[in-house]
Amino acid sequence: MATKPGVLTDWPWTPLGSFKYIVIAPWAVHSTYRFVTDDPEKRDLGYFLVFPFLLFRILHNQVWISLSRYYTSSGKRRIVDKGIDFNQVDRETNWDDQILFNGVLFYIGINLLPEAKQLPWWRTDGVLMAALIHTGPVEFLYYWLHKALHHHFLYSRYHSHHHSSIVTEPITSVIHPFAEHIAYFILFAIPLLTTLLTKTASIISFAGYIIYIDFMNNMGHCNFELIPKRLFHLFPPLKFLCYTPSYHSLHHTQFRTNYSLFMPLYDYIYGTMDESTDTLYEKTLERGDDIVDVVHLTHLTTPESIYHLRIGLASFASYPFAYRWFMRLLWPFTSLSMIFTLFYARLFVAERNSFNKLNLQSWVIPRYNLQYLLKWRKEAINNMIEKAILEADKKGVKVLSLGLMNQGEELNRNGEVYIHNHPDMKVRLVDGSRLAAAVVINSVPKATTSVVMTGNLTKVAYTIASALCQRGVQVSTLRLDEYEKIRSCVPQECRDHLVYLTSEALSSNKVWLVGEGTTREEQEKATKGTLFIPFSQFPLKQLRRDCIYHTTPALIVPKSLVNVHSCENWLPRKAMSATRVAGILHALEGWEMHECGTSLLLSDLDQVWEACLSHGFQPLLLPHH
């Protein structure tokens, strides 16, 4: 929102929320109906193609968003290092409004202007005319309109909304108040209306011009440099006709320079080109990948989780993962992504953060939960994890944390296999079990004297049970085999606090520590108001409305941890899994040992918890009933 929002700041359909697409629905239905029912010789192909073209523009913009987030994660050719936050993502979540607005105007124009009906596919003279008009009047008028928008009166009421994003993403290009978009549409309509009135318009000239605007807008705000220097060497005048991402980035960091739309010619003419333009361009081109201190190695969970990655759907990734209705419409892309990940065996960088001079990255292995459970896939997945560890070691990474199923006991003995295979590697492996156990223990209400533990037992579960028994808390199990397994791990002097519980004695236990494999029947046995606290990496399915469900082991990150603008799987905003935080703590504290394998480290739980709090990480608040 602008500093002092002016008239026509909000879009007309803002009150409709996610139902705003109903605005375009009647036109889309009408154009399709006309195309199907009209005589083939009288069909208006241009009218029919408006809606598919709008969908193409959405896809085009999304491709740019994903590319930008992918390249800026690694650091190569990144222009501005400063991170973005959830406020920026929320502010830019309505980037499709301008496509909706254009679509409505296109439909109205085709119905009102006889010249806009039944356009041919191609007219060379119309394409040349549109290009010349854009180079002259459009670029010239935009330059002065842009300068006017930087006057205090208009800037505070309108244009400051756009400049709220100092670090730009491709969609930042279209984040303006409604009034500005009206002005821009009038400006960009000049070439289109001219070709219509001169009867030189064509479907290609209309679509091509709009795609050109979208492409240049996205490129100019993508925050990584992609125009090679040799293009300007081969054709020096191109410097005046085509801007670069670093050129426009200076406008967002310096504000009073580089006003031109796409052609720097007018900044050269009027003396508003930033003096550091060429220096920044060359410096950015030479920039390599970031030097990384801590890597969190995770993987995809479900086919739909690809959209929840930071490089996926930006607004969707900014909220905890939940299956949404629109995912059914995306099944063609979901299927393609599944096929792609089947053959694409390389991990990729999904996210970067920084904290206390540490550079952090999240790497993703393109495999799903189901594939980790298949015995015949375990060797291949282990090889991928091992390659990731060796790559991190080669790059000088200090700590690598194994997230989700990358640290499975059956898969690699909680990471111990890699230490055995590569005893000389310098990177330290962390499974996060100490911190995860500490988080669960400190999530148990202070006055609790007894807890129920059930589900598939893990290293974390054994650690929690042993620690609670040592503290005098009674740990009850529902299954005899669980009781025997935990008993073998609990120190002998504390075994009196371990109980095999019958169903009749459950009423006094209001705290349940649960893992994967907890059944519906077991949940139903819990009394009303029970608090379920997961000790597993994956959340418990919430079947009881009369009970309280805690998140998986996680912590709220301190404000000094920057570039946090997406949610980690099902966790709330500004929360990180205990495994991921454990890797960061390992580097901050300078601990030299590996923290993985099957051994329990009961004596270190208080140490890791105190270190966590001292660095500003905070436990998640208990969810409201």
UniProtKB/Swiss-Prot annotation:
It catalyses: a long-chain fatty aldehyde + 2 NADPH + O2 + H(+) = a long-chain alkane + formate + 2 NADP(+) + H2O. Pfam families: CER1-like_C, FA_hydroxylase. The keyword NADP applies. One of its GO terms (biological process) is alkane biosynthetic process. It comes from the Eukaryota. Aldehyde decarbonylase involved in the conversion of aldehydes to alkanes. Core component of a very-long-chain alkane synthesis complex. Involved in epicuticular wax biosynthesis and pollen fertility. This is Very-long-chain aldehyde decarbonylase CER1. It comes from Arabidopsis thaliana (Mouse-ear cress).
